[in-house]
C-alpha cells in the first residue's frame, strides 16, 4: 500500500473539514478514524490554522504531513458532505488513490449558493432579526437592504483577500452610518433596530459555537484561538459602529434615542424563523437540513420565552434555551446521521447576543459608561451561560452514548 498517498488522503480530508468550519475534534477524529481503518495508529494535532499528522508504517518508517489551513468560512453543507465521506471511507476501505478520487468528486458535487441567493439570505436574515429586535416594518425593510450592503461589502473584500478584521470594521461602519443617515432623513423609525438586525450577519455565531465545542472536547488551544477571533470580530463591530455614530453626529447631529417596539411571543418566534431562513443561505445549508435548522431556531426562542413566562430571568432563560438547542441539535444529528454543528449553529442564533454588543457600544459612545459596563458584563455573562448550556447538552449525550457502548 502507498502510505504516502494514504496520509495525503487523510490530511486532505481533514483540511476540507477545517476549511468548511468544522470543530477541531471532528477534524482530528475523522483523520484518526480513517487511518485506523487501514490499521495505522496516528498522532493528529489540529488548530484552526494548521493540521499535523504523523504515522508509522508497518515497516517502522515514520511519516509526517503538515498542512496549513487558511481563512475559512461557514459552509455547513460541506461539513456534512465530508463527514459522510469520512464514514464511507471507514466502511468501504478504498485504496488511497480511489479515496483521493472520492474526495475530488465530493468537492465537485457539493452545492454552494450563487451570489444572488446569498444576498437574498442576507436580506432575510437582517430583516427577520430587525423585526425580532423590535423594529417597525420600515425598519425591517431597511435592515434587509443594509444586510445586502453588508453581503456585498464582505464579498468584495473576500475577493481581494482583505483581512477579515478590516472587513468587519468597514461593513459595520457603512451599515451603521447608513442607518443613522436614514433615521436623520426620517426614513426609519428606529435606526437601532435596523442596526441590531444587520449586526447579526457580522456576529461570529459559528466561531463562538465551535469555540465552546472545542473547549468541551478538551481542545483548549483551538478553543482559546477561536475565542480570541470572536473578541476581534466583536471589537471590529464595536469600532465600526462607534465610528459611524461619531461621524453621523458630526454630519446630522446627535442620533436620537429611539423607541424599540415590544412584540408578542408569536411574532418574535416568527421573526426568529425568518432570520434563520436567511442564515441557511449564509451558512450554505441545503436539502432537508434547512427546514430543521429553521425549526430549531424558532423552537429555541420559544423555549426562551416559555422560561421567562414561568418567571425565569434572562440568564435562566438563556441557559434552558441553549440546553434545548443542544439537545435538539444532537437529536437531529443522530436521526439524520449528520454533524450536530449543522443544527446547533442556526438553532442558537436567536440567543447570540448581537444586540447586546451594539447596545454596549451605543452607551459607550454616548458617554454613559455605567450602562456600558452593565450591558457589556451582561452580554459576556449571556455568552458564558450559552456555553454552559451547550456543554451540558453535549456532555449528557456523550455520557449516554458511552453508557450504551459499555452495556451492549
Predicted regions mapped to residue ranges:
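Soluble N-terminal domains of membrane-associated systems
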Residues: 1-101, 107
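Short helix-coil transition sites and intra-membrane helix breaks within transmembrane domains
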Residues: 21, 202-205, 353-354
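Alpha-helical transmembrane segments and their membrane-interface boundaries
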Residues: 73-327, 331-344, 360-408
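Juxtamembrane non-transmembrane "cap" segments at the membrane-aqueous interface
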Residues: 345-356
